[in-house]
From Swiss-Prot:
<keyword id="KW-0143">Chaperone</keyword>
<feature type="region of interest" description="Disordered">
    <location>
        <begin position="1"/>
        <end position="20"/>
    </location>
</feature>
<dbReference type="GO" id="GO:0005507">
    <property type="term" value="F:copper ion binding"/>
</dbReference>
<dbReference type="GO" id="GO:0005829">
    <property type="term" value="C:cytosol"/>
</dbReference>
<keyword id="KW-0862">Zinc</keyword>
<comment type="function">
    <text>Mitochondrial intermembrane chaperone that participates in the import and insertion of some multi-pass transmembrane proteins into the mitochondrial inner membrane. Also required for the transfer of beta-barrel precursors from the TOM complex to the sorting and assembly machinery (SAM complex) of the outer membrane. Acts as a chaperone-like protein that protects the hydrophobic precursors from aggregation and guide them through the mitochondrial intermembrane space.</text>
</comment>
<keyword id="KW-1015">Disulfide bond</keyword>
<comment type="similarity">
    <text>Belongs to the small Tim family.</text>
</comment>
<dbReference type="GO" id="GO:0005758">
    <property type="term" value="C:mitochondrial intermembrane space"/>
</dbReference>
<protein>
    <recommendedName>
        <fullName>Mitochondrial import inner membrane translocase subunit TIM13</fullName>
    </recommendedName>
</protein>
<comment type="subunit">
    <text>Heterohexamer; composed of 3 copies of TIM8 and 3 copies of TIM13, named soluble 70 kDa complex. Associates with the TIM22 complex, whose core is composed of TIM22.</text>
</comment>
<dbReference type="GO" id="GO:0005634">
    <property type="term" value="C:nucleus"/>
</dbReference>
<dbReference type="InterPro" id="IPR035427">
    <property type="entry name" value="Tim10-like_dom_sf"/>
</dbReference>
<keyword id="KW-0479">Metal-binding</keyword>
<keyword id="KW-0653">Protein transport</keyword>
<feature type="disulfide bond">
    <location>
        <begin position="49"/>
        <end position="64"/>
    </location>
</feature>
<keyword id="KW-0813">Transport</keyword>
Length: 87
């Protein structure tokens, strides 16, 4: 049985308040977003900047990754602000 169809609170029959349920959903969404962000940064920045993986990053690779992550985060912030101000 998956987590969406399992009874709340371990199947004891007690109900979960809407507030507790909402906090749980928010936490799960935040975790999923963080995992997706890390994967996106890996594919967009690491794969772009590190052409020959080794035991450590070179100076140019490190600065390339830093710039890439910075640009991606800035673009994400601009898009988020734009979406939330349109509502």
């Amino acid at each position: 049985m998956d987590s969406y169809s399992s009874p709340p609170m371990g199947g004891s029959g007690s109900s979960v308040s809407p507030e507790v349920m909402m906090e749980s959903v928010k936490t799960q969404l935040a975790q999923a977003y963080a995992e997706e962000l890390i994967e996106t940064l890996r594919t967009k920045c690491f794969d772009k900047c590190v052409t020959k993986p080794g035991s450590s990053l070179g100076g140019s690779e490190s600065s390339c990754i830093s710039r890439c992550v910075e640009r991606y985060m800035e673009a994400t912030a601009i898009i988020s602000r734009s979406l939330f101000t349109q509502r």
